[in-house]
Each structure stands twice: as C-alpha cells, then as structure tokens.
Amino acid sequence: PTDIGAGHRGASMGPEALRVAGLAEALRERGLEVVDTGNLVGPFNPWLPPTEGYRHLEQVVAWNQLVMDAMYAQLQLGRLPILLGGDHCLGVGSITAVARWCRENGKTLRVLWLDAHADFNTSDVTPSGNIHGMPVSCLCGLGPRPLTHLGGASPALRPSEIRQVGIRSVDQGEKRLIKEYGLDVYDMRYIDEIGMKHAMAEALEGIDANTHVHVSFDVDFLDPA
C-alpha cells in the first residue's frame, strides 16, 4: 500500500483499514472464496516536489509495475483480483493488466471509473504534479512513456472503453482534454437530473457476455475528499 501519487498522507492505510473492517469475512459470508495475497512492497514515499510536472515519477512507475504484475498473475489463474489501494495512481497498473488480459483472451473491456475527479490531468495542466490526478490520461496514452507504455502497448485504453461516474471536480485544463478525447462523463449534475440508476444503465449500455467489466473505485466517489 502506498500514497506515492497523492499530496496528503493516509491512502496507504486503506488496505489494513478494510481488513480490520472485515471485508474478507463479508465476502466469504456471501459464498465467495477469498485469498488474501498480502501487501505489495515497493519504494517509500520521499515527499519531494514535482520534477518536470510529475511528483515521484520513478516511484510511481515502480509501484504500478508491481500492481500490474500482481493483477495479471491473478487473472491468469482465473481469479477475480480485488486491489485495495493506495491512492488512485495505482489504477494505471491495475487497468493495464486487465486490458492486456482482455486483448490476449479476445474480450472487450468496459471500465467504470467511480470517482469525484476525472483524473485526466497531464504535466502541462496539472496544478499539483500529483500523479493520482493523471491515471486516466496515462491509460489513454497521455503522459510519461514509462506509464503510458507500462504494459508494452499504448494506449492501454481507448476513451470509448471507459465511463466516468460521479465526477464533481474537474480542473480547467482537464475539461479541454476530456472534450478533445471524447470521454463519457456522468457528472453529479447529470446524475442529479436523471438519477444514479439511469446513469448506471447508460454507463453499462452495450456490454454483452464477452465484456469484462472492471470497476475502479475512489472513496471520494461517496464522500468529497
């Protein structure tokens, strides 16, 4: 667990908090087999200022490589991996792994990005340099090569493969990029108008039995950060 891509401490405590809260037991009570493979161990957070628009790029790449390898290994075993972060920069590694597995197995991919933020910043428009605000842009091929090519192929995702739900905070530079790349965004204004049920029905429209659905969930989707 890590907060390497964030600007504040705390996200690294997420996995242990969920364990203590009884996540595994709750899943087992629903008849699921749960295997806790333990924590990944990566570089410490040096808490340095941004360099060329990115904070801790080297460490972020290392963590996402670990995540990608771990996720892909579980998919290869036929399991459904659940990654407990950690800040949302780890979405680069997890979704890159899923996208690779889908390509190799002839599956279409639909990513549901449940978040208060669009996370589509780049080094040119980011107000902070924190890479937890950039995972979606990196997955779509915008960003430093070590992240955009983490799985070898770039982009890992096409904009048409992702639906962003619950968005309520978008930086000015992001708005232009989101419009340029044609992302499907279901922001809170739209959800307030039509309701979450209808918004999710739209976000899931077009999936079939050959579609692998991946959910990437940020806790501020429920409560503003």
Enumerate the language-model features and the residues they cover:
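Conserved alpha-helical scaffold segments that buttress catalytic/binding sites
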Residues: 1-225
